[in-house]
Structure formats: C-alpha cells, structure tokens
C-alpha cells in the first residue's frame, strides 16, 4: 500500500492510498492514451517517466537505481504538458475515494515500501517495513496475454504472486516481467489444493449483479444486471458459487457487488473479462498426482436446500413445547378457578345503603 499526500489548486491537502497494482494499471492506461509521449512510436520522444519497480521486485533491482522513486515518478508526471498532467485519467486517479477515508489495517500497511509525496515537492522516500515473502505458483498450461497489462505464460513457468484479486486475476512477477494472470492457470507447488480458499457459507451474503452474464457451462448461473443473489462460496479463482432463489451455480465474481454499495463505481472498475475457468483450459498439466478437492454442484445444491429448509422452519411460528415457560404459564392460568359472580342486592338493601340517585332510579323502575 502506498500513501500520497496530494495538494490541489484550492490549497487543500488530501491523503490517498493506492496499491501497486492500481498504480501499474494507471501507468499502462496513461501510456496507451499518449503513445507518442510514451515512446511507443519513437523512443527518443518519450517524456512519460518509467514506472519505478518496487523493492520486492528482484528482477528490476538494478534498474530501480536509474528509475528513481515513486515520488520522483509523480513529480515528473505533474511537470508534463497540461494535456497529460491535467487529463481526467490522472486527476481521477488522485481523487479521494471512499476507501481513502478508512485508515489502512495492519495487514495493508505491512508492505515493502510506502512513499509519502510531501507538499514541498522534495523527493523523499521512507521504508516502512522489511522484505516481503511472496507465494510461488506454477503454470499448468500456456497462456497468451490479451492486453498490455497481462503476462504471458508457458507450461511449467514459476511465478511469484504479488496480489490475489477477488476477481480471479492475480498480479504476478517472473524474472523481469510482471502482469495479471488468471488464477485458474496457476497451482501451488506443494499441493493441488488452494489452502486459502474459504469454507462455504450457506447463510449467504447479499450481492447484486453489476453486469449481465449468460451461462456457458451447465453448472453456471445466468443473471441480468441488477438481479440480487446470495454468495455462498467465494473461491480464489474468481468463480463464486451463488444462490438465486433455490438455484445454485458458478458466476464471475468481478460482475458482482455487495448490496448497498456504489454500483456505478464498481462498473467503471471492470477493465477486463471474466477469467477462464480451470475446466475450460486445454492441455492442462499438473505436477500433482491427485486433482484438486472441489465440492460438486450436487453437494452445493443439497447443502443449500438443507440450510434453507432449516431456516424456514426456524422462521415459522410453531406450537410451544410442553416444558416451555410460556406453556407452563398458560396451563397455570387455565387451572385457576374462575371467581364467583356476587348475587344481585335486594330492593330493601338498595333503599337502605345506596345514594339518593340510585334510589330514585329504583323507584322509577318499579
């Protein structure tokens, strides 16, 4: 996680937090928007600075000394011609987001470096923590990248995973390369199973589809934009198991947003398609003799139906058990004798003991 202190023209100062993968995507898009200034046509015309490699990126450790720090990178961007330094893409990147108002947790700040861009513009960089140990994975098949921000793979390539996105796209590095890779093309070295996959939650979490999707496989679910579902299993490959009424199946997590959150912002963040599923990969070759442990759709459906039936029984008001306090109180009330109705007083008793008004009413009735 990187922290920036951004000073705007109205002299206001805002602190924003960005992950390296966000900075990487921003840099790639900026180069695509201004190919001449990025040196894509003629390297001598390049004025957009190189993105400095973080210190955990061993393959670029030597190059980092020449590229400078992230602070210098941002300072150079701000000094570029107005069409670049004031373009909406750059300004939007440094605007305060709702997540910036929440302080990062310890897990978020324990990254290899955090840079602070001071308002006086001087280049300072402070190391917050030491080196970070990255997880190592192996490619089970060849993968051809479809965009500049992705990374191509060959079967057997070993990569280090920098960030595991819930979308199923993982940011990885390999020697001097880095980019996004579908998690379905990767397997752990020590086991075919992904130990970080959480357990199913059949109570479900409410989500909304922010993009329509038509099922391709028989175990998938089709949804229209805006439909509400319950997520019962969040898998790291980006294909979550959802429940729509009594139907369960797989759905791309990147097309889902938690209920009650800003849908439009989530829709703008969809920059690529859903990652391929492991079952659709041809010529996949694992180094492990046994396959991954995965629940079948029948198991998901059976467990989900059982949970829903139990929840409906608990919600339905039923008869009280014989030993319950409420039932005992009702039995006690029924067993108590009813009070006797007193006899009607005689006319002589009324004339002797009642008020004059009551006496007159009695006389008129007679």
From Swiss-Prot:
The keyword Cytoplasm applies. It is found in: Cytoplasm. GO terms for molecular function: phosphatidylinositol binding; superoxide-generating NADPH oxidase activator activity. Residues 1-101 form the PX domain. The modification Phosphoserine is found at residues 279-280, 296, 304, 321, 324. Its main location: cytoplasm. CDD domains: SH3_p47phox_1, SH3_p47phox_2. The keyword Phosphoprotein applies. GO terms for biological process: respiratory burst; superoxide anion generation. This is Putative neutrophil cytosol factor 1C. Gene3D superfamilies: Phox-like domain, SH3 Domains. Pfam families: NCF1_PBR_AIR, p47_phox_C, PX, SH3_1. Residues 132-191, 202-261 form the SH3 domain. Residues 261-366 are annotated as: Disordered. May be required for activation of the latent NADPH oxidase (necessary for superoxide production). GO terms for cellular component: cytoplasm; NADPH oxidase complex. InterPro entries: NADPH_Oxidase/PX-Domain (IPR051228), NCF1_C (IPR015039), NCF1_PBR/AIR (IPR032136), NCF1_SH3_1 (IPR035756), NCF1_SH3_2 (IPR035757), P47PHOX (IPR001655), PX_dom (IPR001683), PX_dom_sf (IPR036871). It comes from Homo sapiens (Human). Keywords: Cytoplasm, Phosphoprotein, Repeat, SH3 domain. PROSITE patterns: PX (PS50195), SH3 (PS50002). SUPFAM superfamilies: PX domain, SH3-domain. It comes from the Eukaryota.
């Amino acid at each position: 996680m990187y922290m920036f202190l951004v000073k705007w023209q109205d002299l206001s100062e805002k602190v924003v937090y960005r992950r390296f993968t966000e900075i990487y995507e921003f840099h790639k898009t900026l180069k695509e928007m201004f190919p001449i200034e990025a040196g894509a046509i003629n390297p001598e015309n390049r004025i957009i600075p190189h993105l400095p490699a973080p210190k955990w990126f061993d393959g670029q450790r030597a190059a980092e000394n020449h590229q400078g720090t992230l602070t210098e990178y941002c300072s150079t961007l701000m000094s570029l011609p107005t069409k670049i330094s004031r373009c909406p893409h750059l300004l939007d990147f440094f605007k305060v987001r709702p997540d910036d108002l929440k302080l990062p947790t310890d897990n978020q700040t324990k990254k290899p470096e955090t840079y602070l861009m001071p308002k006086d513009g001087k280049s300072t960089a402070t190391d917050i923590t030491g080196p970070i140990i990255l997880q190592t994975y192996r490619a089970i098949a060849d993968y051809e990248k479809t965009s500049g921000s992705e990374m191509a793979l060959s079967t057997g390539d070993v990569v280090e995973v920098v960030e595991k996105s819930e979308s199923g796209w993982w940011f990885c590095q390999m020697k001097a390369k880095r980019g996004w890779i579908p998690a379905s093309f990767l397997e752990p070295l020590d086991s075919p199973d992904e130990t970080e996959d959480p357990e199913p939650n059949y109570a479900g979490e409410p989500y909304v589809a922010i993009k329509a999707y038509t099922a391709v496989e028989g175990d998938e679910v089709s949804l229209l934009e805006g439909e509400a579902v319950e997520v019962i299993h969040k898998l790291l490959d980006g294909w979550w198991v959802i429940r729509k009424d009594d139907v369960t199946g797989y759905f791309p997590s990147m097309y889902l947003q938690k209920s009650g959150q800003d849908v439009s912002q989530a829709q703008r963040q969809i920059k690529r398609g859903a990652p391929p599923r492991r079952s659709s990969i041809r010529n996949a070759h694992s180094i492990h003799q046994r396959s991954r442990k995965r629940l079948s759709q029948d198991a998901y459906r059976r467990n989900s139906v059982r949970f829903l039936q139990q929840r409906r029984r608990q919600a339905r008001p039923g008869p009280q058990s014989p030993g319950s306090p409420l039932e005992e109180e009702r039995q006690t009330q029924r067993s108590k004798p009813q009070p006797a109705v007193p006899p009607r007083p005689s006319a002589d008793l009324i004339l002797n003991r009642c008020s004059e008004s009551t006496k007159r009413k009695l006389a008129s009735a007679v």
